[in-house]
From Swiss-Prot:
InterPro entries for this protein: Exonuc_VII_L (IPR003753), Exonuc_VII_lsu_C (IPR020579), OB-fold_nuc-bd_dom (IPR025824)
Lineage start: Bacteria, Pseudomonadati, Pseudomonadota, Betaproteobacteria, Burkholderiales
Record GO terms (molecular function): exodeoxyribonuclease VII activity; nucleic acid binding
Reactions that this protein is recorded to catalyse: Exonucleolytic cleavage in either 5'- to 3'- or 3'- to 5'-direction to yield nucleoside 5'-phosphates
Subunit structure, as described in the record: Heterooligomer composed of large and small subunits.
Record keywords, A-Z: Cytoplasm, Exonuclease, Hydrolase, Nuclease
GO CC, alphabetical: cytoplasm; exodeoxyribonuclease VII complex
Superkingdom of origin organism: Bacteria
Role summary: Bidirectionally degrades single-stranded DNA into large acid-insoluble oligonucleotides, which are then degraded further into small acid-soluble oligonucleotides.
Protein name stated in the entry: Exodeoxyribonuclease 7 large subunit
Protein family membership: Belongs to the XseA family.
NCBIfam families xref list: xseA (TIGR00237)
Main location: cytoplasm
Localization in the cell: Cytoplasm
Length: 452
């Protein structure tokens, strides 16, 4: 990457250059000749200025180069490098003209080896995606009102404290089961996968949270493990992941049924706030009360209409007695009519016989005797029918409920207004209504003794 000075270049065509002109020309030459590139080295002499800019030296065993990273780019790195850190920097070579020192002006930084990790991440992501493990059709919706929530994380993790605090605040009634496992380290991924499988096998929780706090890509790498991803995909319980911060994505996030940006957010997604639940229950109770009141009002209206149409037993009895008297008069009248007609015919025959044969006085006497016997028979029959009518009237009065109540009896009705005739139809504590001859009484059943 060598560049010669052109003899006819405007700057170098002059016989004598100032130092500033020289440095400016060299700086322009370097910027044109060397494209942006990646450089790997060790951080030393790191300084973070009050302005937010980073100044440090990037070195290896054989050389060193001054490096600067301005505040806007430094804020996007995601970590603050420390002396001794191996990093990979993307930047361009520039010349600091006041001193004539060349430097590396960085616009991106990552920890050394992150490129390999990202490639491994991408390969695993593509593999699992091709198997359908990320498909939306596989995702399950966590229960809105879980009975118990499981948490897979480290017992020492700040994420666990955040989750417990959020759940205690939002849903103190929910039981919490912790499945402890390290969240970083050599065996973290396998132990996390084992706890997910254990929670799936036990089925003692309704929702499972897989959480840890933020960190570097190396700190979060356990959650990019294939075995853990398959354990989450095979879990019989809906899984909510909350790993790192909002900008962090892991393979576990893609496989989980629901991804939360933080552990606290995962806890919030796992349950409905108690206040919201109580409010919803209050609204539901109000709607139920209004609906029940409407039903009671309609039932009361129907009862009023039915009561208006219902004839009391006394009225029914009076109506029947009136009808009975009418029938009795009609019966008496119908019995007298044929009797009077027969007597008139006999009298007419007797008169005709008397005119034609005075000697038939004996026959006339006999006819009169028969007429009297017929009259007595008709009267006896009428009397017998009158006695039967009186007996029927007495029976009708005996069956009158008002008459029965007047003798000291009572009618017992249940809460629905039905007449109760069997003690076994009642239960202790049930409300009943007792109808008396004068008024009614409400009572509660304290003892039931069926007839043996």
């Amino acid at each position: 990457m060598t560049t010669g000075f052109a003899a006819k270049d405007d700057v170098f065509a002059r016989d004598i250059l100032s130092v500033a002109q020289l440095n400016q020309a060299v700086g322009q030459l370097m910027e044109r000749s060397i494209p942006p590139l990646w450089v790997r080295g060790e951080v030393s002499n790191f300084t973070q200025a009050a302005s937010g800019h980073w100044y440090f030296t990037l070195k290896d065993a054989g050389a060193a180069v001054r490096t600067v990273m301005f505040r806007g780019r430094a804020s996007m790195v995601g970590f603050v490098p420390r002396p001794g850190d191996e990093v990979e920097i993307r930047g361009r070579v520039s010349l600091y003209e006041p001193r004539g020192d060349y430097q590396l002006q960085a616009d991106a930084m990552r920890r050394a080896g992150v490129g390999n990790l990202f490639e491994a991440f991408s390969r695993l992501k593509d593999k699992l995606a091709s198997e359908g493990l990320f498909d939306a059709s596989r995702k399950r919706v966590p229960l809105r009102l879980p009975r118990a929530i499981g948490v897979v994380t480290s017992l020492q993790a700040a994420a666990l404290r955040d989750v417990l605090s959020a759940l205690a605040r939002r849903a103190p009634q929910v039981e919490i089961v912790i499945y402890p496992a390290p969240v970083q380290g050599a065996d973290a991924a396998s132990r996390l996968a084992a706890q997910v499988r254990q929670a799936s096998a036990r089925r003692e929780v309704d929702t499972l949270l897989l959480v840890r706090g933020g960190g570097s890509i190396e700190d979060l790498w356990s959650f990019n493990d294939e075995d853990l991803a398959r354990a989450v995909a095979d879990c019989a319980i809906p899984v909510i992941s909350g790993v790192g911060h909002e900008t962090d994505f892991t393979i576990a996030d893609f496989v989980a049924d629901l991804r939360a940006p933080t552990p606290t957010a995962a806890a919030e997604l796992a349950c409905v706030p108690r206040a919201e639940l109580l409010s919803a229950l209050g609204h539901a109770a109000s709607r139920l009360s209004r609906a029940q009141q409407r039903r009671l009002d309609l039932a009361a209206q129907r009862l009023d209409r039915a009561s208006a149409q219902l004839v009391s037993p006394a009225q029914r009895l009076a109506h029947q007695c009136e009808r009975l008297n009418t029938l009795r008069h009609r019966l008496a009248a119908s019995a007298q009519r044929p009797l009077a007609a027969s007597a008139a015919r006999l009298t007419g025959l007797a008169q005709r016989l008397a005119r034609r044969a005075p000697q038939t006085a004996r026959v006339q006497d006999r006819v009169q005797s028969l007429a009297q016997r017929l009259l007595r028979g008709q009267q006896a029959g009428l009397a017998e029918r009158g006695v039967r009518l009186q007996a029927l009237a007495a029976q009708l009065r005996a069956l009158d409920p008002e008459h029965t109540l007047a003798r000291g009896y009572a009618v017992l009705r249940d809460a629905q207004g039905r007449v109760v005739s069997n003690a076994s139809a009642l239960v202790v504590g049930e409300g009943v209504r007792i109808d008396l001859a004068q008024g009614r009484v409400q009572a509660d059943i304290t003892d039931v003794q069926p007839r043996r």
